[in-house]
Amino acid sequence: MSGGGDATVSAELIAARKRLQAAGVADPLVDARLLIADVTGFSLTDFVMKPEHPVTQDESARIAAMIERRAEGEPVHRILGHREFHGLDLLLSKETLEPRPDTEVLVDTLLPALKEAVSRKGSARILDLGTGTGAICLALLKECAQASGIGSDISADALETAAKNAARNGLDSRFETIRSNWFEKISGRFDIIVSNPPYIRTDIVATLDPEVRNHDPMAALDGGQDGLAPYRLIAADAGRFLVENGTVGVEIGFDQRLDVSAIFASHGFSLLDAVKDYGGNDRVLTFRR
C-alpha cells in the first residue's frame, strides 16, 4: 500500500489515509486505522507506540485491497465482516442489516422492563422479529442472565449469522432462531417483543446514501409505500403473543412517532415511552396493553 521498499505501519497509515481522503471518505483516518488494525492485529495504542513496526508484503497487499474497497464506497464494517454492538462482536452477512449505534437505544430502553419481568418471575422470554444479526436480542440476553430469546427472520442467511453470533458471544444456550414471516411460525408468549423493522418509504429508498442502499439488504430497509407496513403487522398480532403486562418495543424513523403510536393505539396498546436517539431524533417507542 505504502509503495516504499521498507513498509511500516506508519507508512501504511499515511498512504491509506491519503487514498481515502482523495476518495471523499468521511473519516479517512478512523477507517484506515480500523482496516490496518484488522490485518496487523494492532490496537489504537500500538499505532502510537509502534509506528515503525514492519509490515510484510502480504499484509501490505491485504491492506491495499481493503483500502481500495473502502475508497470505492463499501462500508468499513462490511469489509471487516463484523461490527461491535452494545459490547458484542457481531458477524455481518449479505442479508443482515449492519447494526447502528442508535439501535442500542432500543436495547437500553427495554432493559428495565426485561429486568422487571425477571424480578417478578425469575425468568423472561424475548421475541426479536426480523432479528438479522441477532443484535437486539443478544444484547438484551447479555445484560440479563435469566432471560432467553428467539430471533425470527424470513432470511435463512440472517438466521445462520444470528446463530453464529450467539455462539461467538457465549449466548447460544439461551438463544434460538426460527424462520418466520413475522408471527407466522411463532408460538408461545413473551415478556418482550422487539423489532427494528424496515421503515423507510419505498420512494425514499433510492435516495439513500449509496453506502446504505448498495450494501444493506433491501428487505431490511423498505417499509412499503408509507414506511408503516411492518408496524401494522406487528401491532395487529403482538397482543396474542404477549404475557400479561408484556412490553412491545420498536425502532422507528425520525418522523414516524405519531403514526406508529396511532397504529398501536388502534389495537389497544398504550404508549409507555418515546425515546430519542443520540442525534436527538425520535427513535424508540414502547407499548403495553
From Swiss-Prot:
Enzyme class: transferase
Superkingdom: Bacteria
Enzyme Commission number(s) from the entry: 2.1.1.297
Pfam families attached to this UniProt entry: MTS (PF05175), PrmC_N (PF17827)
GO terms assigned for molecular function: nucleic acid binding; protein-(glutamine-N5) methyltransferase activity; protein-glutamine N-methyltransferase activity
Family: Belongs to the protein N5-glutamine methyltransferase family. PrmC subfamily.
Protein's name in the database: Release factor glutamine methyltransferase
